[in-house]
Every structure is written in C-alpha cells, then in structure tokens.
Amino acid sequence: MRGGLRHPKQAWSDTRLVQACLDGDADAWIALLAKYKNLIYSIAIGYGASQADADDIFQTVCVEFFNGLPALRRVESLPAWLASVTRHRSFHWRRLTSTRATREGTTLEDAPPTRLAVVEDDVVERAQRDQRIREAIDRLPPRCRRLVQLLFFEQPPRPYADIAGEMGLALGSIAMIRARCLKKLQSAIHEAGL
C-alpha cells in the first residue's frame, strides 16, 4: 500500500493488537507503535523537545511500553496510559535539560521559549476516537474495508480507475459500492458510540 496505513495490522483493534503483542507477534508491535507514534511525539514536542530529543523520548516510552504491556489491565486505558508515561518521560527529560543548562551556566530564561505543556485531555480523547473509528473500519466486510482504506488512507489519493483495477471492479461501480460501504461504516461508527 502506498502511504496511508503502513501496516495492515494497524487497522486492528487495540484488544487484538495487544493480544498479538503478548503472543510475541513482532508485526503487531510495529503496528501498535505506529498507531500511537503521533500521540507520543506530540506530547514530547509539547514539552519543548527537539526532534532528536523527541526520538529519544519515543524510544524510552517504547521500552517502558514493551515492559509494561503484560501488566496492563484494561486495553481501553492504553492511550491514557501511554500519554501518562510519555508526560512523565518528557518531564524527566525537561528536568535533566534544565539541570544540564544550569551547570553549563545558562538558565531556562536564556533558552529559546518552549511550550512546556501538559497534554490536554483532548489529545487522549482524539486518540481514543481515532481508535474507535479504526475498529469500526476493521468490522466492515473485507471488500468495504479495503475500499475505505484505498479511498481515504492512501496518499496521494488514487484515481478510481486504479482502485477499480486493483479490486477487480468495474470503474462505474466504485461510486455505488463506496456509498454502500460508507453507510455500513456510518452504522459501525454509530454502534461505537461516536
């Protein structure tokens, strides 16, 4: 797949991914981290981390995630747990950076301004909403799921002719099938409480 979902398992529910991770599926780990990478990076950068420092924070969170996943009691709390771990690691990074700057004779006032911020609840809520949408897509019949992925998750967007060819459909039928699939997706999203 070009762009969009990088890994087929990324569309799996967190419950399914967590179980696969606990069963030793390396691809499930890759998919689970890909799903929450933006959440982790947004928190680290919100604490003023550079890209390199955010990379380090991400790696530290991944290690803690790997070690802590077997103890996770409720999969639904995964985004909030990851946000909490990331805030803690980002705060720790910020404290070390501040201490190092003080030893080197600079102060935080001398440093460029940063957005030292506690991630707002809406970031976690957005991650949870996105997860419920991915789960709704995952519940679609295979043809609808694939069509939704091709139409809405590919970057750059692909022409209908390419999609029709890949799926073995008549070009003129794509719009009608798309409408039916979107209606099914709307029902699945409604069932998910969105």
Indicate where each model-derived feature is located.
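Structural recognition of an alpha-helix C-terminal capping motif at a helix-to-coil junction
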Residues: 56-63, 76-88, 176
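Short amphipathic alpha-helical boundary/capping segments
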Residues: 16-21, 132-141
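Arg/Lys-rich amphipathic alpha helix in sigma70-family domain 2
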Residues: 70-74, 84-105, 126
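Short amphipathic alpha helix immediately N-terminal
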Residues: 33, 137-162
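C-terminal flanking helix
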Residues: 37, 41, 62, 145, ...
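Short, charged helix-capping/linker segments at alpha-helix termini
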Residues: 2-8, 22-30, 41-60, 71, ...
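Internal acidic/polar
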Residues: 10-11, 100-123
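DNA-recognition helix of helix-turn-helix
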Residues: 87, 91, 160-191
